[in-house]
């Protein structure tokens, strides 16, 4: 196949879809071969000038089921039961700042969820970042739920104002890092995917900074220079294998020692874990380890965003 066969078109800003397709088919341009990836350093650096520290990286876990668990809710209505929140400061320091999980059987979590998210983010005007459109869609769905509620909470207006401020079109609209990756970054190992589960291993294998930073047990370490974490202690994220580097999501252990119980290491498993938690007859010990697995998984999602940002930042600095 030749470039002409794809009808390649330039994008207004960054890579177009057809240009990404050609990188996947034709390989990296000569000037990118030594790096092993394509990064629009100038475009990314310019885009970053519009961001404000501290950076707030957030990720949600949600469910939408045919038979609602909560009284008065509709089939397939969005339920937001969990979020994770990392902060990246201008000096490069990182911390797992906040987390939220409400999986008590019969308790509709959405309003408490957005209330906790608001409390986590209103302390400054730092840029809020997500991966893909999911978080934006969920917040808008919660806004609709608030507006349609016959007996809304007393703080409905404040919650809606907050949602409007960080969703698309708002004065503090979230930055979609998946969209940034689509326009600015391509690594052959992702096979064209912009899933965070594909992008994270690609930056880990290529970034000397990440190797140095996470190739030692600093995450969740109480020692000087350690990265504060709610759910990990002395965690080593960068681990060499014969094939390259271990995918961090594969380091998340199964909920129980039962081989038939899968690890919570992707969104579908997180949703299933939440659904299991809605059954009141779940033993307390199993409930505890399931909730812990959910917390660890969601924390890794926002840490993954931090790592990707750090890799991009240091690749820009290497040139500039």
Residue ranges and their predicted role:
Residues 1-320:
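DEDD superfamily 3′-5′ metal-dependent exonuclease/proofreading module
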């Amino acid at each position: 196949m030749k470039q002409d066969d794809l009808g390649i078109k330039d994008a207004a800003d960054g890579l177009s879809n057809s240009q990404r397709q050609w990188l996947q088919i034709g390989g990296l341009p000569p000037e990118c071969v030594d790096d092993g990836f394509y990064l629009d350093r100038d475009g990314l650096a310019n885009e970053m000038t519009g961001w404000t520290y501290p950076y707030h990286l957030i990720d949600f876990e949600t469910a939408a089921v045919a038979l609602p668990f909560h009284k008065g809710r509709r089939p397939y209505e969005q339920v937001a039961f969990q979020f994770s929140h990392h902060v990246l400061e201008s000096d490069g320091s990182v911390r797992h700042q906040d987390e939220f999980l409400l999986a008590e059987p019969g308790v509709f979590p959405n309003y408490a969820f957005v209330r906790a998210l608001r409390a986590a983010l209103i302390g400054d005007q730092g840029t809020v970042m997500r991966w893909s459109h999911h978080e934006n869609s969920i917040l808008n769905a919660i806004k609709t739920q608030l507006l349609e509620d016959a007996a809304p909470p007393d703080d409905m207006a404040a919650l809606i104002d907050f949602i409007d401020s960080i969703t698309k079109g708002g004065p503090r609209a979230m930055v979609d890092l998946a969209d940034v990756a689509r326009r600015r970054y391509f690594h052959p190992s992702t096979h064209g995917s912009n899933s965070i589960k594909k992008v994270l291993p690609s930056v880990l294998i290529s970034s000397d900074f990440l190797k140095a930073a996470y190739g030692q047990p600093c995450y969740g370490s109480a020692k000087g220079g350690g990265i504060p974490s709610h759910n990990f202690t002395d965690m080593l994220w960068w681990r060499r294998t014969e094939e390259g580097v271990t995918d961090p999501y594969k380091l998340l252990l199964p909920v129980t020692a039962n081989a038939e119980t899968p690890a919570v290491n992707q969104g579908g498993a997180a949703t299933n874990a939440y659904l299991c938690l809605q059954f009141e007859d779940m033993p307390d010990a199993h409930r505890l380890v399931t909730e812990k697995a959910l917390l660890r998984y969601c924390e890794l999602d926002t840490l993954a965003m931090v790592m990707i940002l750090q890799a991009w930042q240091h690749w820009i600095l290497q040139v500039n």
